[in-house]
UniProtKB/Swiss-Prot annotation:
GO MF, one example: cyclase activity
Record GO cellular component, one term: nucleus
Gene3D superfamilies on file: 3.10.450.50
Species for this entry: Schizosaccharomyces pombe (strain 972 / ATCC 24843)
Superkingdom: Eukaryota
Designated name of the protein: Uncharacterized protein C11D3.04c
Amino acid sequence: MSQDSESFIRQLFKAFTDFSTDVESLRGFLTPDYRQLVDGRELTLDDFISHAKALRTHLHRLDINVQQIVCQGNKAATVHIAHAIRSSGESSRIKVIAFYSFKDGRISLIDELTYVLEGGNADRELGSVQ
């Protein structure tokens, strides 16, 4: 699934950052038992959907620039930069290092660490805001 994994991750990022996309459609990318580990916090599938909704409430725009991606079998890893613009106009850039596991053609796990490159203290919570 290596080539497909890269395409799949890029499609997920596109849907995740397109705020006109129905948030519930993101479930199609993830397994029912999905888990996301973000800076020591654990999110379930429902938590992830709540997270996506919260981002759409707090942000005007979100862009993700994939800097590196490696895929092998049912595993993948990315280094990407999330550029968030709040409704107030403030912006932040967050570096994300993420590991992915796939099961049954969907993502079952994302384990990620984030680092705020530009922004304030509140931006540290953007990776798991509810």
